[in-house]
């Protein structure tokens, strides 16, 4: 192989270079020896390049390792501290009642930017995809924080409106106020009794108090102020005229404590007891008088005076009703009902007395003879009346003569005045039930009048009584 390969290179070398033969024979041998390694080196270099072009099918990457690598990339990102701060603010706004405002996060962003600029740190990394992910995450948490702030504002507004509505509707001031000076009110009357004076001066009142099974209970704060409250359960009068009875107290924690007061421990002025008991009994009497449906006399006097001052237009406006309700300590419904009843009971009889109209009376009297017209015609009724001689003061058809009604005009005025006087005595009633009864009576009268009108317009032939002569 060496002998066949050497002549060709030798020829080429000789053709190109004019060199002596001995050096030339050495040179082909050197080229022949050096050429195979060059080919082998070329083959060795090409093999790694082919392997590097296809690394995926040979060795697949573990998903867990890729996830850990992505986590480390997120943790090392320059915007990760800002993302952590925003996430903590969202958690605080969700857990507590005090919501973190969005303005505070704006301040945190400004501080973060200044800190990064002072430390000469970048805001983004070399991976654009990771930078986009961090910016989108910060935007989402920012929107979430704004929504939490809106929800917190709505909750606070709802609570404020609800509390205001409760205070307005329930009248908490009126509910908490106690006119009798209850056991927990600050103006509680102190029942401080001197036992001997009480037994000597007011034995009847003492016997009534000692038999009361309920007693009086006060908190401990009232006892510290010198006011002693006692329950008169199983009270006894021992020797020496002293009073011995157990006392029930309520502590500041709400516990009920029963103690026995020894002889002579209750020493208070008798005059104060008399005043307190008198005021208590007076208030009870006033409450018992304020029954349902009965208005106070001073309230009716105020409303009656307003009614007579406005006879031309006895309809108070809403503002006037509120003013009258404030003066009389009544509700708007009570004031409205009283004026409705007063216009019907007081003003209407006065108008009827001043303008007598006998037509309604004649119509009502005429309706009393309804059975005569219902069961036979007018011709039959006239024949019967002629046989009986007729009733005095009546027409041949059985109706009452209108001339006799003229004498009722004075009676009408008298009855109207009597009704007005009776209404003045009864105007203190609420009158809601009487309104319903009067309306029902008026409806019944209207129905009866309609039936009478229909019967008057009915033909005799419709009743099947055409041959009236045969029936006489």
UniProtKB/Swiss-Prot annotation:
Residues 46-56 have a biased composition (Low complexity). Residues 291-350 bind DNA. It is found in: Nucleus. The keyword Nucleus applies. One of its GO terms (cellular component) is nucleus. Its main location: nucleus. InterPro entries: HD, Homeodomain-like_sf, KN_HD, PKNOX/Meis_N, TALE_homeobox. SUPFAM superfamilies: Homeodomain-like (SSF46689). Residues 96-179 form the MEIS N-terminal domain. One of its GO terms (molecular function) is DNA binding. Residues 429-454 have a biased composition (Acidic residues). It comes from the Eukaryota. PROSITE patterns: HOMEOBOX_2. GO terms for biological process: regulation of DNA-templated transcription. Residues 361-371 have a biased composition (Basic residues). Residues 1-62, 351-371, 386-405, 423-472 are annotated as: Disordered. The keyword DNA-binding applies. Residues 26-38, 396-405 have a biased composition (Polar residues). Keywords: DNA-binding, Homeobox, Nucleus. PANTHER family: HOMEOBOX PROTEIN TRANSCRIPTION FACTORS (PTHR11850). Belongs to the TALE/MEIS homeobox family. This is Homeobox protein PKNOX2. It comes from Pongo abelii. The gene is PKNOX2.
